[in-house]
Amino acid sequence: MGKKSRVKTQKSGTGATATVSPKEILNLTSELLQKCSSPAPGPGKEWEEYVQIRTLVEKIRKKQKGLSVTFDGKREDYFPDLMKWASENGASVEGFEMVNFKEEGFGLRATRDIKAEELFLWVPRKLLMTVESAKNSVLGPLYSQDRILQAMGNIALAFHLLCERANPNSFWQPYIQTLPSEYDTPLYFEEDEVRYLQSTQAIHDVFSQYKNTARQYAYFYKVIQTHPHANKLPLKDSFTYEDYRWAVSSVMTRQNQIPTEDGSRVTLALIPLWDMCNHTNGLITTGYNLEDDRCECVALQDFRAGEQIYIFYGTRSNAEFVIHSGFFFDNNSHDRVKIKLGVSKSDRLYAMKAEVLARAGIPTSSVFALHFTEPPISAQLLAFLRVFCMTEEELKEHLLGDSAIDRIFTLGNSEFPVSWDNEVKLWTFLEDRASLLLKTYKTTIEEDKSVLKNQDLSVRAKMAIKLRLGEKEILEKAVKSAAVNREFYRQQMEEKAPLPKYEEGNLGLLESSVGDSRLPLVLRNLEEEAGVQDALNIREAISKAQATENGLVNGENSVPNGTRSENENLNQEESKRAVEDAKGSSSDNTAEVKE
């Protein structure tokens, strides 16, 4: 999915070319685990911590060079085997072929005309690698004992993939051999390539992803070397950081949620063939047919013979695409930038604002988003800003009296301002906030555009620069949009225009104002929205999984094109104790904003 690359050549079962003592690596991984489990660094210290962790990781990688289980040849050499295996096991293989599209990497090309909404691809459950198949594999005994594997389906899936890759007779070998040998996620970035992301809003997630992955590797290296149920794993003698990074990235870029066989809950899966489709703007057209027990995909649009077949991965930002899928999508209509906002507890009106926000179902501090499209803010952010800028009298009106509930109900609707003065204040605040964020970048929009003209830039460097450029363009648009709104409402105030009042008869108007809420209302924390540290963050071991991404599904038992971690309904305290060595300290406290 997305741009793929295969730099190394790898063959199942090749032996190690280097010798290194497990004890030596155990000492290094213990040091790494300690470093990754330390409290979150203070402001401005994240880069320093990242470099320190990276130095340890690179030291481990250097000592493990040549120890990974590998495949010979190029991934495309194995495409015929994949198609044969898929056909023999009930998947559709007619009407498309796998082709290298250069810029986008490998994808599916139509070999006949395919009509919009035509079912063209289906993959039965038996071909999927799932958490359930992991439980029933050689990984089963360790899975039954390790609370991390039980709590985090994505990690279980990553180890399932590694164990099956190391087994030449694995049922899934025809699929695994066609996976990329490496990816373009930030886990594979050189330090200089990551440096391009300094000062961006996305850099915090990049640091978190790298730290979490390093911590997980260090934790599981010890488990594999010391746990009695790990003795029979094919990873016992060779579990390298390179292996884990590859497995994590394979899952991160490909995992999806499907219903379990009885349809009672969701589980994570890798879906052969389907995961070859590249992304474009549109709607989710993939679902899971429980009756036939298979994943099904209908065409997003008409595709003529010879054209690439695209699917829609979901309403993801480019930060999410880069960090979790390893590609940047130009003209992303769902692009957005995170903005952390909170009501300061030192605010004289904090208690009243907190109560109004609570009644509206909005936290006093959270991570919101500024959007690429108009309007730049969601209904929830609009509601937050209105409350944030309210006077004491306006707060009382939303807490007391017969009309208080109606006022709460319309907080997120742009058609019903609290007051003209309140609108002027909130748009002024947003304009100032976005302007301040723009000033934190070390380069300008013009400078980024100039740098992108350099033909010598690596693919990953170009992605990083495009990402920071995209953030700035969204912030700049937000500044301009806020300025226009500020002036509009200032004029309304000066002209003493009458305020629109909500009445029950306005319900149609309220329902028609969907533009304010057509995108995710809030990013509740820095990792929830990001697909797979979404995938691979230990803290998510004790959080409730969501069955769909961004609420976009294609039918009752749909597969969203993008997932969160599996919910195993663990007791929170039990899980917390079980994962103490591996979990990270919370780093997503939002900054308070003082009025």
Swiss-Prot record:
CC terms in the record's Gene Ontology section: chromatin; cytoplasm; nucleus
PTM remark: Phosphorylated by GSK3B, which is required for recognition by the SCF(FBXW7) complex and subsequent degradation.
GO process terms (BP): actin modification; peptidyl-histidine methylation; positive regulation of DNA-templated transcription; positive regulation of muscle cell differentiation; positive regulation of transcription by RNA polymerase II; regulation of uterine smooth muscle contraction
Entry EC number(s): 2.1.1.85
All residue ranges annotated as the SET domain in the record: 94-314
Family as reported in the entry's similarity comment: Belongs to the class V-like SAM-binding methyltransferase superfamily. SETD3 actin-histidine methyltransferase family.
Name assigned to this protein: Actin-histidine N-methyltransferase
